[in-house]
């Protein structure tokens, strides 16, 4: 009944209708599914995306429409006029130069770090968030067989387990572990990895091992804390909230990717109201994001640059100008040297970690290959940014520290 309601709500935007699959049809879709006790399955259709690429598309869309976007700039304190926030003192992390940025309205949309910014504005501010760490494992597609995803609605601890084909690999997750504090690069733990392996093996004919995983990664969820102070983060709110401080700083937090536009709408409406700005229609309901295919671009799975949309032509141009850029970053990675150069020139990549984790997803697909690719990426970045060999050495060491922390629980 729930999935039929899902179909009805999707209406014309539905991919296909959900339905029941018998035992044989289920095994045809998921050949490694455990046969004992299997009677059938429910099939439904959903979408997936690359969160890093969507974040870049949103930032570049804003730039296309006149916004100023700065990378590696840290807010150190707010600026005030007559008790109202009117900007921020920020510092360029690379040069150390400080700047004052003035604004009619100030919005704090810093994800898991919103409480740190709120404390800059009001040291007595009550934290809004209870952070949760989610760990995921990545395997070769052959470990599971078939092209379908597997969703288990309720695991041993009452959570959802998923096995999802993604970018030619398979992602398995997730956990939901309460954590104190924040981290730029949270690392998975052996306990979480073993939990995921045990849970997924309960449904597999041929089990996977921890050491079969090509990569492991973790992220922090900005969950809105409940009034009861529950430490069970799976029960905390995934919805977004907006809070306004006494000085007028508008904070938006919580939420999820599927509601990002509504989050932005609510935030801008509140900021405009507080600043006394006149309301005007927003174009974002139908606004094409940067790179949206115009009908002449390839969307084939075999096209290695399909995810770049109309920017695909720039990457092909880089290859024409320098054929060596057609080479992969590593034989086991689906990314080219051209993507690293494009990341620097067009997507504000400044570090090896930027290229291998936040422009491509190499670190999250095959950690060993990403580690091996790091020195070559450092050389490409150094040539683009005018850095010396000492900088390259530091970059590789910094990336190695992150990658080794991710790799440790699966080795």
For each predicted feature, which ranges?
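Core beta-strand elements of the Rossmann-like FAD/NAD(P) dinucleotide-binding domain
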Residues: 94-105
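C-terminal accessory subdomains/tails of enzymes that are appended
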Residues: 1-36, 42-52, 64-65, 80, ...
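Short, hydrophobic/aromatic-rich segments at coil-to-beta transitions
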Residues: 84-88, 147-148
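Aromatic/hydrophobic pocket-lining residues that form π-stacking "cages" and hydrophobic walls in ligand
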Residues: 58
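Short, surface-exposed charged micro-motifs
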Residues: 77, 102, 160-162, 241
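Glycine-rich beta-alpha-beta "Rossmann" dinucleotide-binding loop(s) and their flanking helix/strand
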Residues: 62, 116-137
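A conserved short coil-to-beta-strand element within the FAD-binding core of flavoproteins
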Residues: 71-86
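Short beta-strand segments that buttress and anchor functional surface loops
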Residues: 44, 88-92
